[in-house]
Curated annotation (Swiss-Prot):
Annotated protein name in UniProt: Small ribosomal subunit protein uS2
Matches recorded under PANTHER family: 30S RIBOSOMAL PROTEIN S2 PROKARYOTIC AND ORGANELLAR, SMALL RIBOSOMAL SUBUNIT PROTEIN US2M
Annotated gene: rpsB
Gene Ontology BP annotations: translation
Recorded superkingdom: Bacteria
Extent of Low complexity compositional bias: 253-269
NCBIfam families for the chain: rpsB_bact
Transmembrane segments: none
Gene Ontology terms: cellular component: cytosolic small ribosomal subunit
Disordered: region residues: 227-277
SUPFAM superfamilies the record matches: Ribosomal protein S2 (SSF52313)
Record flagged with keyword Ribosomal protein: yes
Gene Ontology molecular functions: structural constituent of ribosome
Length: 277
């Protein structure tokens, strides 16, 4: 069965690019035509590239890898958090903090601080402190939760990064490339395909398009988790694959049950990316 259908892509508005005056010439090969001053993306190519990205993500996770989901624009925040959480992967859907990948040792210390503050709050560690001290500690915890909550369980840099809008997330993309971490991303008509290892030509501004493609990537993760656990067709886990952690085993049932949801997207009015900045 196809990972996603042409109809689903059309219904989500994935074929609408930016206005013809706002484009990156490097994207020419992915453009089918232009209509009323708006580029139309070649969805036949999109389907092909989706299959390549899906297979890469599935194999990466099957061999013990993790995928970091990144999308801080308003249209992507909800689906990024929802889909990453569904399959137990880290995500960033608020502001990207410089050095999240290239200076991960420092970021990891901040994560430890977040867990320390949460433990203090839950075990009565705030007792005996002044109201001002409690307020300051609570504010610190909330700030860390907002900026780092999505990567709280990330113990090392990810094996790959999924990005919605490479232009907006250029710092994240740059850090990934600097470390040699493969980038999978939606490529709108104003993006640079040279900075992405596994591109998926499509509309990165429409909520439904971003959600559909993010769900596809999450479903690939779910299938990879299933393969890692040695389930699916009953085969043994791939050689060299890491065993599932306990928390991953708990997530597996729910994650794999939702893996087919990407093919159940309902029809919706298409959204173009012309109104987005």
């Amino acid at each position: 069965m196809a990972v996603v259908t042409m109809k689903q892509l059309l219904d989500s508005g994935a074929h609408f690019g930016h206005q013809t005056r706002r484009w990156n010439p490097k994207m020419k090969r992915f453009i089918f035509t232009d209509r009323n001053g708006i580029y139309i993306i070649d969805l036949q190519q999109t389907l092909t590239y989706i299959d390549k990205a899906y297979e890469f993500v599935k194999e990466t996770v099957a061999h013990g890898g993790t995928v970091l989901f990144v999308g801080t624009k308003k249209q992507a925040q909800e689906s990024i958090a929802e889909e990453a959480t569904r399959v137990g992967m880290p995500y960033v859907n608020q502001r990207w903090l410089g050095g999240m990948l290239t200076n991960f040792s420092t970021v990891h210390k901040r994560l430890q601080r977040l867990k320390e503050l949460e433990a203090m709050e839950q075990t009565g560690g705030f007792e005996g402190r002044t109201k001002k001290e409690i307020l300051m500690l609570t504010r610190e915890k909330n700030k860390l939760e907002r900026s780092l909550g999505g990567i709280r369980d990330m113990q090392k840099v990810p094996s790959a990064v999924w990005v919605v809008d490479t232009n907006k997330e250029h710092i994240a993309v740059g850090e990934a490339r600097k470390l040699g971490i493969p980038v999978i991303a939606i490529l709108d008509t104003n993006c640079d395909p040279d900075v992405v290892d596994y591109p998926i030509p499509g509309n990165d501004d429409a909520i439904r398009s971003a959600a559909l493609l993010t769900k596809v990537i999450a479903s690939a993760v779910a299938e990879g988790l299933q393969a890692r656990a040695g389930q699916g067709s009953g085969e043994k886990p791939a050689e060299g694959a890491e065993p599932l952690a306990e928390w991953e085993q708990e997530l597996l049932a729910g994650a794999t049950a939702g893996a087919a949801d990407a093919s159940a997207e309902g029809a919706a009015a298409p959204e173009s990316s012309t109104d987005a900045s």
